[in-house]
Design a protein with these regions (language model features):
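Long, low-complexity segments enriched in small/aliphatic residues
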Residues: 1-50
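Long, contiguous, secondary-structure-rich segments that constitute the structural scaffold
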Residues: 44, 48-64, 68-176
Length: 176
């Protein structure tokens, strides 16, 4: 509390400015994406391994979604979708589950970033890293820890040809 930071008053509090900002985002983007730690790897370590790859859907990171949200968007189990907001867009494979609340979707963090066009600043991530969609800001000026791994998004069926996953390809070397 002695640092004088508005966001660190020294006791639990309700941040109405942040709540108002979140309400504005929710009005534009109807689905709340929660990104948790993965069960098949340690953060992003071993994403290239067989255990992690076995969890992918058509090579993409899985996204869990309530069937009613999927039905409203013409999305089916096992299909690939585009998940997007103002910060970017990713591809993900869909699992449907009644255990996910309507209006909420869940993905694990740690899929290796695989931009469709590495030269483009907001290129589509074809592998499914939710960090593309979350805000890049610390939790406070005091701690600079990770902010909550959640954001507001919309989801649409991917109807184009799927681009190949290249995140696991070895680097290209130039011989001199």
């Amino acid at each position: 509390a002695g640092f004088g930071y508005r966001e660190c008053p020294g006791h639990p509090w309700w941040d109405e400015q942040e709540a108002a900002r979140q309400r504005q985002e929710a009005a534009r983007w109807p689905l709340h994406l929660l990104s948790s730690q993965p069960r098949a790897r340690l953060h992003s370590q071993y994403d290239h391994g067989s255990v992690s790859r076995a969890t992918k859907i058509q090579g993409r990171e899985p996204l869990w979604m309530h069937p009613s949200d999927a039905q409203a968007r013409d999305i089916r189990e096992g299909s690939v979708v585009k998940v997007y907001n103002d910060r970017g867009a990713i591809l993900a494979g869909v699992h449907l589950s009644e255990q996910i609340l309507p209006g909420v979707v869940q993905m694990s963090t740690g899929a290796w970033y695989d931009p469709l066009d590495p030269k483009e600043e907001r290129s589509l991530d074809k592998h499914g890293n939710p960090n593309v969609l979350t805000e890049d800001r610390g939790s406070s000026r005091l701690g600079q820890g990770c902010s909550a791994q959640s954001c507001w998004v919309e989801i649409a069926p991917w109807r184009e040809e799927l681009p190949p996953i290249t995140a696991f390809d070895p680097p290209k070397f130039i011989e001199v």
